[in-house]
């Protein structure tokens, strides 16, 4: 045995390590040493400041916080399972090496906020948005409750923290969804704050510990198999606190964004196209049927932003939007005629099964596919004047083998997202797709082609039970 390593392990475990413990944990001795020398008093001071600033309504005393912190940092002394020890070491290491820079810094004085005047009066867009959504309000209301609707009582506290986090870490974290639109239009209400970031796992682990030490709650992190690079933080009642998509720095650099009050939000043009794409998903149409007013103000805000930015004249002249498309139901591939626009391809093959797309890209022996992760939810490849991509939502049919206009528009929006992320000019097709929303009549749904079914196991990080599964 190496005496130095053995002493580090003994100090950490509060006992002389067994031969098994020594040989399995010696590779972790540097991380264990970091935990051993970690200044818990300074850490507790940061937790207290975070509590005062973001969780002041939580009734927890300083002595209770101290006990929770010291209990966790001595937990290994009562743990003999090697697997659990590895989990404790991994989580403690993340906490001692990242917490100060990620969450501790939020309690210090931040940079001055440069107030933005990017706010929109959407009154002129309300009727257009209302009429457009009314023409798409064709789903039957479902009684099922989606997981995203079960909201934790901690959401308001975490939202307050997230607003500061987005300002301090605006190079690595941006937001989209209702909060980002609230920044454009304060009339829009929001629930939790939707974020994309480059260090999602580390951030959520640090946040989980902050909540644990302030509330005593056993919060858990879940990784969902059918959503790539997605993690959600849930409280002890299995209610949603916050979720986050992790993206590469390269993807972050591709995303068009605007700065409002020191917070970067995904460019509302991308958000409008994503909404048009999302409306092809049947459960989103069910949400529309339940609460049309909620979506109308968001839709109107996005339309007003795009109208202003691109100087769009709203006259109902949609030209070739949605782009003509046909479906092969057996192969689950849609062919879109894109030749009417100045794209680098004349047609697009839209796959409804991601594995089929991946297989065909491999068979093409092409290595220049691009993947914008959760921003587009698909890889893209241009080969021989054809764009190959994947569409992750349901496809609505309005007749036998006839794609419903809602889905056809959603697919066209998906293609425009690719064009925008590649920094190509989309002003003409964007003008057409916006005008394709005007003067439409309701078309009933004839059939629903299901979305791609993802398989796999949920990953979990449970601090209380010392579990990490991938």
UniProtKB/Swiss-Prot annotation:
EC nos: 2.7.7.19
The residues annotated as the active site are 192, 194
Q: Which UniProt keywords apply?
A: ATP-binding, mRNA processing, Nucleotide-binding, Transcription, Transferase
InterPro entries linked to this entry = PolyA_pol_cat_Poxvir, PolyA_pol_cat_sf, PolyA_pol_nucTrfase_Poxvir, PolyA_pol_nucTrfase_sf_Poxvir, Poxvirus_polyA_pol_cat_C, Poxvirus_polyA_pol_cat_N, Poxvirus_polyA_pol_cat_N_sf
Report the SS bond pairs: none
Matching entries from Pfam families are given as:
Pox_polyA_pol (PF03296), Pox_polyA_pol_C (PF12629), Pox_polyA_pol_N (PF12630)
Subunit details: Heterodimer of a large (catalytic) subunit and a small (regulatory) subunit.
Sequence similarity: Belongs to the poxviridae poly(A) polymerase catalytic subunit family.
Functional note:
Polymerase that creates the 3'-poly(A) tail of mRNA's.
Task: From the Swiss-Prot or TrEMBL record, give the protein name.
Answer: Poly(A) polymerase catalytic subunit
Which species is the source of this protein? Deerpox virus (strain Mule deer/United States/W-848-83/1983)
